[in-house]
Amino acid sequence: MSVGRGAPPGRGATVGYSGTPLVRKLGIKPGARLGLIRAPEGFDVTLGELPPGVRIRRRLAGEPFDVIVAFHTRRAELQRRLPRLADALDPAGGLWMAWPKRASGASTDLTDNVVRNLGLAAGLVDNKVCAIDETWSGLRLVYRLRDRPPRRP
């Protein structure tokens, strides 16, 4: 499945009207622990240049993540994986759930409402939406302040 053209090396992708670099849209800050889960081929180029000290992991094991970007195309799979994704998230972090846009032509049974409802069932609420690229939409899920688990090392 295509993830769009991507951005030239050293520049962040800007999709949509905002002109905001993707790294900024996703809230990736210097020193962040970034999880890229099931990222499509070429996503590193689409993401663009990262802030200093960002540590990328592609598996959920290890210390909690500040930002996770997880790509899914099927509701059943997302529903099965969401509790583990939420558990891997730092309590103050953000979990970006990405699914193919309807206009991309990719086969999917996910929509923003499906992702939002699955997030709510897992104890997370949405607080941002983002056009990741020409193929993928994203919804940021976070723990409510009152529901945040204790911080882990």
What does each model-identified segment do?
Residues 68-78:
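Short, glycine-rich nucleotide/cofactor-binding loops
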